[in-house]
Amino acid sequence: MVMATTLFLLAGLAEIGGGYLIWLWLRDGKPVYLGLFGAVALALYGVIATFQAFPSFGRVYAAYGGVFIFLAVLWGWWIDGKAPDTYDWIGAVICLVGVGIMLWAPRP
C-alpha cells in the first residue's frame, strides 16, 4: 500500500507539474525550456505508472484519476494560491474513497 501510494503521488506530481510548466510556457509566455521540462515530466508520468503492482491498466489509471483530482486541488491551493471551497474538498475526498474501494476492496 505504501509503494502504491508513493507511485500515485510521484505520477501526480509529474503529470500536474508537467502540465503546469507547459501551461506557463503557452498561456503565460514563459520561456520555451519550461515547456520542454514539462514534456519530460509528462513522459515520466507515463513511465512511473507502469511500476504499479496492480495487474490491470484500466484499474490503475481509473484509481489514479481519483488521486489526480485530490492532488490538483492541493496544487491549485499551494501553487496557484486558489483556496479550495467546501465542495472541492468533499469531491476530492469522495474520489479518494473511490480509489481505496477500487484498489483494496476484497475480490474473489
From Swiss-Prot:
Keywords noted in UniProt = Cell membrane, Membrane, Transmembrane, Transmembrane helix
HAMAP family for the chain: UPF0060
Query: Where does the record say this protein resides?
Result: Cell membrane
Q: Which domain of life is it from?
A: Bacteria
State the annotated membrane topology for this chain.
Multi-pass membrane protein
Question: What is the protein's given name?
Answer: UPF0060 membrane protein BH2744
Its GO CC terms are:
plasma membrane
- Signal peptide residues are none
Species for this entry = Halalkalibacterium halodurans (strain ATCC BAA-125 / DSM 18197 / FERM 7344 / JCM 9153 / C-125)
Q: Which InterPro entries match?
A: UPF0060
A Pfam family assignment: UPF0060
